[in-house]
């Protein structure tokens, strides 16, 4: 597996950090997959996913979103929701230019799934397909009403106010090794600003309401026991989207399907779905 890093500067001066992984023999590349990570994450958490895809003949390109990993900016914050979608747009541009003539896919998780789905619906990109795991369309729990009401006021008067509340590692996976990696990760964080949080809530609702406008073949997978994001909401999205969106529920799994003990089953499903799209 060959690896290189890339970087670019956004119009507002924010320096973005990305990574590319591809098979040693570039002639063996059948497709390129753009990775979009979740809240508090970074591309370093997806090396094993990139390796799996490389071994299956897919190049992989990903980037640390604004306020995450080695990309600049206040942790857990973005100036606008549009700025997050611009990151996905740049990701797909890099994928297409780096591997001309090769089918391009998206693979997005959690918060990244929210952004990716909104990008698919609002921008209607010409790509071969998308895979979304555990998308944050709605939370799996209901925050206290008073806390939400205060948060909405804070969003208006102090949008960059930060709440530091890391996710419980045990809610992410049942794999002890992956839990330890998560806890020891120096680039991971649990920070999110008021503006970022409510932007996600609004975008999630919008995506569900407009799911029937989906034009890109999509595989959506969710842990049925997810304690972070709502599997009911992602199933609702898939139902609204119609036959173009296939939904798979994973019993006995937690939020991070690709970090679970039985992740090889998930990887197998991903590979078969991607290969199936290439065969069409």
Residue ranges, per PLM feature:
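Catalytic nucleophile-loop/oxyanion-hole region of alpha/beta-hydrolase
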Residues: 40-43, 69-99
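N-terminal cap/lid segment of alpha/beta-hydrolase-fold proteins
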Residues: 1-25
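Catalytic active-site module of serine/aspartate enzymes centered on a nucleophile-bearing elbow/loop
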Residues: 244-280
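Conserved alpha/beta-hydrolase
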Residues: 50-73
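Active-site glycine-rich loops that stabilize anionic/oxyanionic intermediates
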Residues: 33, 38-41
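Alpha/beta-hydrolase-fold enzymes
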Residues: 109-193
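Short beta-strand/loop motif that positions the catalytic acidic residue
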Residues: 214, 220-222, 226
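Short alpha-helix in the alpha/beta-hydrolase fold that links the catalytic acid
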Residues: 216, 230-240
């Amino acid at each position: 597996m060959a690896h290189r890093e890339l970087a670019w500067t956004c119009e507002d001066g924010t320096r973005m950090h990305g990574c590319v992984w591809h098979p040693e023999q570039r002639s063996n590349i059948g497709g390129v997959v753009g990775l979009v990570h979740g809240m508090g994450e970074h591309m370093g958490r997806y090396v094993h996913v990139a390796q799996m895809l490389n071994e299956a003949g897919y190049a992989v390109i990903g980037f640390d979103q604004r306020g995450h990993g080695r990309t600049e900016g206040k942790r857990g914050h973005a100036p606008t929701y549009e700025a997050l979608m611009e990151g996905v747009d740049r990701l797909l541009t890099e994928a297409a230019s780096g591997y001309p003539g090769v089918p391009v896919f998206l693979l997005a998780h959690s918060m990244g799934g929210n952004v990716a789905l909104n990008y698919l619906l609002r921008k209607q990109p010409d790509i071969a397909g998308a895979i979304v795991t555990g998308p944050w369309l709605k939370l799996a729990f209901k925050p206290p009403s008073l806390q939400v009401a205060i948060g909405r006021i804070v969003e208006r008067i102090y949008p960059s106010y930060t709440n530091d509340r890391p996710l419980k590692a045990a809610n992410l996976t049942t794999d002890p090794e992956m839990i330890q990696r998560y806890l020891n990760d120096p680039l991971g964080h649990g920070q999110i600003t008021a503006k970022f949080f409510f932007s996600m809530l609004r975008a999630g609702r919008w995506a569900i309401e407009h799911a029937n406008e989906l034009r890109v073949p999509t595989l959506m997978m969710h842990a049925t026991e997810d304690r972070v994001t709502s599997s009911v909401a992602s199933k609702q999205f898939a139902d609204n989207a119609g036959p173009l969106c296939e939904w798979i529920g994973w019993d006995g799994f937690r939020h991070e399907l690709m970090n679970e003990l039985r992740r090889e089953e998930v990887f197998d499903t991903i590979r078969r779905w991607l290969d199936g799209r290439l065969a069409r």
